[in-house]
């Protein structure tokens, strides 16, 4: 998976993702039944094959918009269009549309994207129209971000004239309509956040009326980055970083730091390790087996890296943040890093952090605050929560979701202490009465 991974520029990383897509699509032809859904096991389930084809089409959709930056992007896009077309319009897809009309748009993701890119298939469009109409009243219950996906696919398929019924209500119910839980959110919560934004914005090509201010959504994205970086979930880091180019916003210091982390790992390994990647398993393998393991466990992370770099190119390609740290932040990073426990030296992101200048470290102090507070809360260490909030007050970092929610946590903790103290007093009084 090395092809272009060592290229320092965004174009090289887009090319790398497209080369990986070509290899993944070629692997489908060699698919054999696997032992379950684990993508680390050789072979692909039918649903996994559909996922690869759909995500490959999404990668092409993003990369096509950046093709004017380098002719090699167009060449790589053209190389994968053919295999995508073959799978997107196969007999299996036709059968799935007819048998499962309630999920017609999901079955036709790659077909719809190809049509949008100028590769139509009128006959399959006719069948899709029939099946989609038949399935309108059936199909699965969908979470808000999946409802937004349906609207995104409808827009791609039908163009700008197709209305988005109830979009505002769906956005309000989605993760874009509420503050992310800085301490209790899971990977799936962050996934719902990133995908709601992908679909609502058409991967950055559309500006919907969002239910909250952009600044609030960006704060949530930075909170999500703290979680993803601290768990070393680089696939998720890349997804969250899509927030900035999709909203057309300059990259924040936290976002730039996270991107540096991704590129450092990708350049060291030759690919970006995915969520299912286990270094110990990878290191046991050699040759083709090792390359296949890296490909199948990490293709998605590298696709998302391709999305990210393509969208960044479309927005001008500037990732470097040159703004000096606010004077109020000076010294915040040193104070916060001291609050991380003895495992600090083994933190996955620590090497990138230590490579920063003191001024750069202070610029990412909101990220450090979020990491420290989440670790302290989940470890039950309210003393560290208090100390971290004291640093936040001193350096004017109190506006982040992590700080606000940590302060609320301490207030609830004080109530709990008083509640149990009162209960203990009541029990003591009851014992005295019984003795008397």
PLM regions: where:
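Core register positions within helices of long alpha-helical scaffolds
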Residues: 59, 110-113, 153, 199, ...
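Eukaryote-skewed repeat-based solenoidal scaffolds used as protein-protein interaction platforms
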Residues: 85-235, 247, 256-263
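Terminal, non-catalytic domain-edge segments
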Residues: 1-66, 130, 135, 174, ...
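Extracellular glycan-recognition/adhesion modules and their associated mucin-like linkers
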Residues: 45-49, 237-241, 245
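Amphipathic alpha-helical protein-interaction segments enriched in hydrophobic
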Residues: 231-242, 296-304
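Compact integral membrane and secretory-pathway proteins
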Residues: 40, 81, 105-107, 111, ...
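An N-terminal, globular interaction/scaffold subdomain
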Residues: 29-116
